[in-house]
């Protein structure tokens, strides 16, 4: 994602003749810095592509509050987006484009190919260890095929291989940092307390690193944290 999001942001801006000041996520600064080095090698004039590595409250705020910045494009959390929009409005009313996290459910109907549906939903949730703004973490299944879908989903989750992502055959690596690791574990606990049924996973995988077992709940209340 660091490389993809950088391309999505740089491409349109540069194609329209703009210069870019890009702040990377503090967890993944190296990709953007390397791309900037390649851009320099390719002959981009100095000052056209500018990369800032830092934290949101300092480096990010400097961009969103700056009077000479005409447009801000932000990908991240809804909470941070509020801060970005407020800073943009209070400074020079700069335009803002946002790509934020969502929790839209996937829907499986009774006439679906269940094996295909299970594989699709599995990928939709666990892709990139669930660290995706459109991760399908909720699934609504029509009543007639609910039990079979749940059974197949649990079987697939239990087969998912967890470990070093640089090892061949491994499907799931660690979460990116302590904050994400703790957030997921906290949501698992909230799921248990809500009355949802924990069918597999639900705890740390191994004794080191930010690994979490592939986790599946069923009978999730609609008003619970993990169900809403």
UniProtKB/Swiss-Prot annotation:
GO terms for biological process: ethanol catabolic process. Keywords: NAD, Oxidoreductase. Pathway: Alcohol metabolism; ethanol degradation; acetate from ethanol: step 2/2. InterPro entries: Ald_DH/histidinol_DH, Ald_DH_C, Ald_DH_CS_CYS, Ald_DH_CS_GLU, Ald_DH_N, Aldehyde_DH_dom. NAD(+) binds at residues 76-81. Signal peptide: none annotated. Coiled coil: none annotated. The active site is at residues 99, 132. It comes from the Eukaryota. It catalyses: an aldehyde + NAD(+) + H2O = a carboxylate + NADH + 2 H(+). Belongs to the aldehyde dehydrogenase family. This is Aldehyde dehydrogenase 9. It comes from Polyandrocarpa misakiensis (Tunicate).
């Amino acid at each position: 994602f660091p490389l993809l999001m950088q391309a999505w942001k740089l491409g349109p801006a540069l194609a329209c003749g703009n210069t870019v000041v890009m702040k990377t996520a503090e967890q993944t600064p190296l990709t953007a810095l390397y791309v900037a080095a390649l851009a320099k090698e390719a002959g981009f004039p100095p000052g056209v592509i500018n990369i800032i590595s830092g934290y949101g409250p300092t480096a990010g705020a400097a961009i969103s509050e700056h009077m000479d910045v005409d447009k801000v494009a932000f990908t991240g959390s809804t909470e941070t987006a509020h801060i970005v929009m407020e800073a943009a409005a209070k400074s020079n009313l700069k335009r803002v484009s946002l790509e934020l996290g969502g929790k839209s459910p996937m829907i499986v109907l009774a006439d679906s190919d269940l094996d295909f549906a299970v594989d699709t939903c599995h990928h939709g949730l666990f892709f990139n260890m669930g660290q995706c703004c459109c991760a399908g973490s909720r699934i609504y299944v029509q009543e007639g095929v609910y039990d079979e879908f749940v059974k197949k989903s649990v079987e697939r989750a239990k087969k998912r291989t967890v470990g070093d992502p640089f090892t061949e055959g491994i499907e799931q690596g660690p979460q990116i940092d302590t904050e994400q690791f703790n957030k997921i574990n906290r949501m698992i606990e909230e799921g248990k307390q809500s009355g949802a049924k924990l069918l597999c996973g639900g705890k740390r995988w191994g004794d080191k690193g930010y690994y979490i077992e592939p986790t599946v709940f069923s009978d999730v209340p609609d008003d619970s944290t993990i169900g809403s």
